[in-house]
Swiss-Prot record:
It comes from the Bacteria. This is Glutamate racemase. Gene3D superfamilies: 3.40.50.1860. The lineage of its organism: Bacteria, Bacillati, Bacillota, Bacilli, Bacillales. Keywords: Cell shape, Cell wall biogenesis/degradation, Isomerase, Peptidoglycan synthesis. Provides the (R)-glutamate required for cell wall biosynthesis. Belongs to the aspartate/glutamate racemases family. InterPro entries: Asp/Glu/hydantoin_racemase (IPR015942), Asp/Glu_race (IPR001920), Asp/Glu_racemase_AS_1 (IPR018187), Asp/Glu_racemase_AS_2 (IPR033134), Glu_race (IPR004391).
Amino acid sequence: MKQAIGFIDSGVGGLTVVREVLKQLPHEQVYYLGDTARCPYGPRDKEEVAKFTWEMTNFLVDRGIKMLVIACNTATAAALYDIREKLDIPVIGVIQPGSRAALKATRNNKIGVLGTLGTVESMAYPTALKGLNRRVEVDSLACPKFVSVVESGEYKSAIAKKVVAESLLPLKSTKIDTVILGCTHYPLLKPIIENFMGDGVAVINSGEETASEVSALLDYHNLLDATDEEIEHRFFTTGSTQIFKDIAKDWLNMPDMTVEHIKLGK
């Protein structure tokens, strides 16, 4: 019987990471939990985010996952190291992979970071980037409206274009040549963000680099699955199963997927 890779996020954003993992590792089985009922995590304090992240983690660990991907930047910043220390399975977040991808892309060492308020205030990206390259200059920008645009399914709409233009205006006057999408919801807005920032700015979706790290870690721990056993992906949400399914079907191209509603916490 296949063991799944577990993915957790505050909502549908982590599906952007799942998509990249399934591209690179098509034999792997995915269990995904989106805490849509309590989304967004960005404005919440670190202790509350850590508590919610542990609740999601325990739910998937109880279902026998072989690895955990914290596919949420805010949750990664709040709880990655604590969870990694206490679990006996491999655990990765999305901040280090995103930072590495940005440093590969930049030509002038001037990098912008778009994130939730929680991620920006944590200074997790500047810390990670400067830990890898001390010469890098980082401009961080909180974009609190982006998550609600994605969660409402409006990420291809005129509303999305307006919100992106208004939110990113401060970055247009900087000399950055690379932007990290420092929230896993934001890649659903990537075409609009790329169009607004222009051809001279590389827009980094940390999902690809995270997927490469997932592959490397599974290989290192001898957990890669190359068998042709039947794959049963499972998707869980604390919010509306229909809204989750509509976005997930569009993003993952899984027309027959089912989504299970669960409750977390009290």
